[in-house]
């Protein structure tokens, strides 16, 4: 975030001629992350880089958010941009948030989702008994194939693995680097389960409605650049990690084959989408439409029949 959020703030300030200034506060400085949503609704916070994933229990469109999708729906940044920007998933999320007093600026990449381990995980069958820190639908996937997933704050993950409480963890790749998890997990498993993991920019509707049209345009234009920059930085730094850092860290990269990818897609991801369509989509037409869009996209890409 240090590579992209300060430049976004600077761009808004410069393009607005100093009329619109955003003050940066990092996670937890103003409110706990679960309080971001109500704080935006109340206009206590005006803008946040957050995710509907965190509130999928109370925000039905959270089930459509990129970080909550099961593995191998999107397999490239181009897939993500096609699905969210062109086929209408961002539109559906934005409509759902608008009803809850949130103006939605859109989804963006925060890097690809992988997992890593103390021991080699060479195939899907090796997941049995694997104790792993993951999140959302990734936890559901792990459990389906015999692993034992838990949810744990990122700063606690290193010690849990070092002490043997966990065998590994998974999330956006850069946390493997930033938390030095390569010191306790020398095996990095791919391909990425989510390409990419996503987050979103939310604005308090009250704050957004108070902006004149020219400043709204400034924020929207800066958001487009923010999305591009975030994706570019994540991609460049991930490539550097694979090309250079793995050797320095002593990391072994293990990439599963097509059979395992197809098996996850067929045995878990598609049934997961069908379940969401049935259980959530039956109550919320936006979710039903979104799941239909996602499945048609996967068919068009040849990922499912």
Protein language model regions, located:
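N-terminal secretory/targeting leader peptides
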Residues: 1-82, 91-305
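Basic, amphipathic alpha-helical recognition segments used for DNA target recognition
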Residues: 88
